[in-house]
Every structure is written in C-alpha cells, then in structure tokens.
Amino acid sequence: MGFWIGLFKFSPVFMLAGLMISGMDCLIAAPIATVYAFIVAAITDKLKFNDLVECAVDNVKHLNLVFFILMFAYAMAESFMSTGVGAAIVNIALNLGLTARTVAVVGFLVTGILSVATGTSWGTFAACAPIFLWLNHIVGGNILLTTASIAGGACFGDNIGLISDTTVVSSGIQNVEVIDRIRSQGFWSVGCLIVSAIIIFIISNSMGLPTDVANAGLAIDAIPTEVMEALAVERASAVDLLNQVKEGVPYYMAIPLVLVLLVAIKGLPTLICLSVGIVSSFLFGSFAGTVESLSSFLDLIYTGFEGAGSWVIVMMMWVGTFGGVMSKMNAFKPLSNAVMSLAKNVRQLMFMNGLLCIAGNAALSDEMAQIVTVGPITRELVEENVEGSEEDMYKLRLRNATFSDALGVFGSQLIPWHVYIGFYLGILSAVYPLHQFVALDIIKYNVMAFVAVGSILILTLTGWDRFIPKFGLPSEPHVRLKKKQKQDKKSNVTA
C-alpha cells in the first residue's frame, strides 16, 4: 500500500513531464501540474488548502532575488546585442582572416565568447551560423565540423554566463548565488573550452583542408537575400548583429563584456555585475554612436524587463509553487529511497544526480523542463540524505546546479530528438540550403558536448575534480550519507 501511495504522490511529476513532452509550454504545464499536486496532497496528507498555499508562497519567496537577476540579465542581453558589444567581439576575431583549417575552431571560440555576452545559445547560433557557414563555404572547410563547433561553442555561455536564463534558474532552484556558481565551475568550464578547441584544431588539420584566407565581409555579402529574410523570421536580433558586423563597430565596444567578467571575478554580487554591463554598454555605445539617445536605450531595458516578465519569471513562480507542494507531502521520498539503496557514498549520490539530469533531459527533450523538473528532486536528495557543514552542503548544491545546467545545455547536443537540435536544424536549413542537415551531423562532431558531459560525470565519480581549482566536492567524512552515519552508530553500539 505504501508503494502505491508513494507513486500517487510522485504522479504530479509524471503529469508535468507528460504535458511538456506533448509540446505544451511550461507556463501552462506547470500550473496544471501544480493544481493536480494540490489535489494529491489534500488526498494523501489531508492538507488544507490554506496550508498548501502558505508552503507554496514560502517556497517562492526564496526566488525573489532570482527574479531581479533575470530582469537585469535580459536587459543586459538586449543592450549588448543592440549597442554593438556582440558585433565587436565577432569582428575582433574575424578581421584576422580565416582558412579552412581554422574556421571551425575560430567559430567555436567566437560563439563561446559571444554566448557569454548575450546569455543565449539559440541567439548566438542564429547570429553566427550565417557568418561561419558561408565563410566555411568560401574557404572550403568541413561543413559538419564547423556546424557542430559553433553549436558547441554557443552552449558555453548558456552554461556559465551571468545573463543565461538556464544559469539563473538552475542556481535559483538549488538556492545558490549565480556568481558563486560561476566561480566554482569557472576553471572546469574554461578547461573544457580549451581542450575542445585543441581537439577541433587537430581534427581540422588532420583533414588536409586548404589554407586560403577569407574575411567576414565576403561571407556576409555571399549570403542570399532569401536567407536573410528567412533568418529575420527565425531570429530578428541575429540579422541586426549581422548588419553591425558588416558595417563595423569600434573594437572598444567589447570593453563592457570585459568589465563584467572582471567584476564577476572579483566576487561582487550578480546584480552589480549586470548593472556594470548595462551602464558601460550605454556609455561606450553613446561614444561609438550605436546608442541614439537615453530614451532609446531605456527602451532596450524595457524590452529586457518585459521579456523576462512575460515568460521565465512567471514560469519560475509556478515551478516554485509546484516544488513547495511536492516537498510538503514528501513526494520525492520513494525516489530518494531508490537512489539511496544504490549509493554507497556521497560521490555516488552526486553522480546519480547527474544521471537523473541526463535521463530527464532525454525524456523531456527540453533543457529548461529538465532543470525545473529534476532540479527540485536532486536538491531534496542531497538535503534529506547528506550530513555536513553549511559550507560543504552549499558546495554540493553548487554541483547540483551545475549538473542541471551543464547536462541540460550540453546534454541536449547529444540527444537527436531534443528541441535544441530541432531549432538548430531549422536555422541551418534557412541560412545554408546547400547542405541537407540531419541531427547526427551536429552530434558526431560536437566535441564540446562530449568533453563537457563526459568530464563532469567522470570527475564527480572518481574524485578527480579535486585537481581543478574551486571545483572539488567535499570528501568524506566532511560530508556523509545519513544512512551510513546510522550504520556506523549501530556498529559502535553492537561493539
């Protein structure tokens, strides 16, 4: 009987997952699943409506700071895209000239840096795909390697960027500061970027590709008009960035991104980092002529706030409500018991949390759906089953947040039916109709995805993460499974 009650309590998760798999937006699926969770909690635990509302509101209160971060993040993304920060980053790299042997690795690095500035992998891919695919066409590079490289690079900033919605949401669900997340995984993320770049460069040179030089202007001029029109429909902001790249913006417009990174490295609060980016993009943009007036710049801020409030903030409020109700009735206890029956130590538990993220991503076919569905489960698995100091427990929550984000974003690149891949294929067919792309084209050459997903799981399980600065998990006996603690006490009593 206990099994069936536990399964019934967990059924709201199945409903949320099923609705999202069917294609329903999370903004609709989450409220429906939440109402169902209210009903289940009332039946199984005899909880009153007011009690459920109170626990739901209390859970959402913890996300208030996250909501402000999301608004500022969207505002900074708008300002960076419109004032020329993104275009300056692209031009700095492209004006050096490219060959068939370097187009893939340069595309990888440019999209990696640009995605940090814009906070969006989809927007970065849409903006850079026309440039690098037509550059690749001109110099005679390998189209599949270049495509997969910019796909992997575009995911870099979506996993570690201050203004990435997946970074902010995954951190909020685990109740960790975004800036702490970035600092804890920074060396690992940059290490993955460097290792992947080296591998891509080696692959390019092993293909015996030509060494003729081309530039971005030629590539953009080569893009057919109908392609630009199709891209405007798919991602209008990408067309604006392409035009800025073609017309040129001063190189110093990249300084706002540098300032944001420097402030972040200093460890200042996330809101201050984002504010520095917004203000500096206005000041430098005014000097460069990319900002027409204070009024027009404030319109960008308004657009950013509106974008955050129209979906992601409302979605997170419902997800927070859902998580509060599920926790109130101990809905995750059966899953916790199943995982704990297999985990022999904290590292194995954390490794299984990573596997849960991958499984959720594959099942839901959406990285944000995985983050909001699996995130509360992995958080409760740690909080209910691990003992340690507040500092050590915080480090475990940081890894859970990194799992949710990294295995959501990079994991998506290895799942053929994922919405990420579907979006990429749509962009590719629009901007480069000379090749018929399929999902495996992106997957088999996506070096960054393989390196990131494989390394974080292996490092977590083996304990080799201790060799990466700030990335190591606390070891036993500093953190211990509660069941192991009980077993040790029982053994001492017997002795």
Question: Which residues are covered by each model-predicted region?
Answer:
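Hydrophobic transmembrane alpha-helices of multi-pass solute/ion transporters
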Residues: M1-E78, S82-T102, A238-E247, I255-W318, ...
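Transmembrane alpha-helix interface/packing and boundary motifs in multi-pass membrane proteins
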Residues: G18-G23, L109-S121, G152-D158, L262-G267, ...
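Juxtamembrane and boundary regions of transmembrane helices in multi-pass small-molecule transporters
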Residues: S22, N159-I160, S171-S237, Q370, ...
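Juxtamembrane helix-boundary/capping and inter-helix hinge elements in multi-pass membrane proteins
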Residues: D45, K61-H62, G140-L144, V169-I182, ...
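Hydrophobic alpha-helical transmembrane segments of multi-pass integral membrane proteins
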Residues: M71-A73, T99-I131, M340-E383, S404
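Alpha-helical transmembrane segments of multi-pass membrane proteins
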Residues: R101-I113, G140-N159, Q348-N361, E387-W417, ...
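Re-entrant/interfacial helical elements at transmembrane boundaries that shape
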Residues: G123-W134, S164-V176, L335, M368-V382, ...
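Central hydrophobic cores of alpha-helical transmembrane segments
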Residues: F125-F132, I150, C273-L283, G354
